[in-house]
Amino acid sequence: MSPQNLKKSLTNWDLVSVNPIDKNWDWKTLFCFWGVNIQSVIGFSLITSLYVIYDLNTFVVFFGTILGTLLVYIFSNLIGKLSQKNGLPFVVLLRSSFGVIGAKYFGLIRFFVGVFLFGIQTYFLSKAFSYLIRIAIFSTEPTILDKEIFLIFFLGMNLIDWTSIIIAIILQGFLFSAGMNVNKRIIIFSAIAVYFGMLLFFLSVLLSDVKFTSQAFLNILKTQNFLDKNNFGPLITVTSTVFAYFSVVILSFGDFSRYVKDESQLKKGNFSLILNLLIFSFFALFIVSGMDAFLKQDPENLNRILTNPTDILGKLDNLFLIFLALIFIIIASASTNLIVNFIPSQYTLVNFLPFSLSIRSAGAIISILGFIIGIFWLTFLSQVGALSF
């Protein structure tokens, strides 16, 4: 292969070292980055389930989650430092370990996993859009939803569902492919907006009956026998669970740390994950405990405590609160999809065909594949156990 062709097969402008002018991420940006990663529906369910479902000592869960995030902090610094220093995405740095060809095919595995999860996440994101549309129609004219056109289903979805998944894929593809400066704004906006939404719901639960909800929060805390040797196993399990939750993000962290100003900002920003965990855990746990206390005043809701935000919304009878919560869920889900699945898939695909693709064209391919995966998720992929591995 000639030197010119070899150069074309190795790089393009999206893979080269970041211009120093574009190294504009500081610790506050990384605070929002880690906030987005924990603010997902899965993150909400995971944190609250660890505290209230498995009958674990509260201190065991607390210190287990702290230890887990400390491990994330250490490994994120190790992986992120190289990308921050050299301004290169993670998949390009892999060339030093796996070689050019090895890095391409290793990255391709990450691409397939990322695109598959992007499609699934897009499907669930579209469900939130469809709920918004249904609420809007129901609030205007409820009988419209009974029309025959809405009773026709294809691949398990009706007209509203198809409209929703098309909206979800177009919005994500358009916004996420606009460049890292736009993605940075999305990340910052999402983190702040979701925390603002959680604060609103926290206050709405608290102020509905301060004494009742505060007592409900205290009642779910289990602090006895923390130093019991039998708690060591659960402590390790919680630590491992939290680390596993962030492991996909750690693997691709260099795709983001390449934009960080310096190593000091990198370490400060990564340490903010612990602060994010504390803030998010408190809000999530208080909302879940307070809602559970109110719901269990009805004998029909005595069976189990709800930790999934969508399950909690299903028990509300206030359309405005449901509508508002769905908007925050959409923001959180979309931004998580951006960080965990879309951007890493872009870089790995461009690295595989650097002479043919750009970030924008790779984004278009990911959007198309994600759409195909999303529309077949309900009727086919979920039925064959596509995530059983």
Give residue ranges: language-model regions.
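Membrane-interface loop-to-helix entry segments
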Residues: 120, 126, 163-208, 270-273
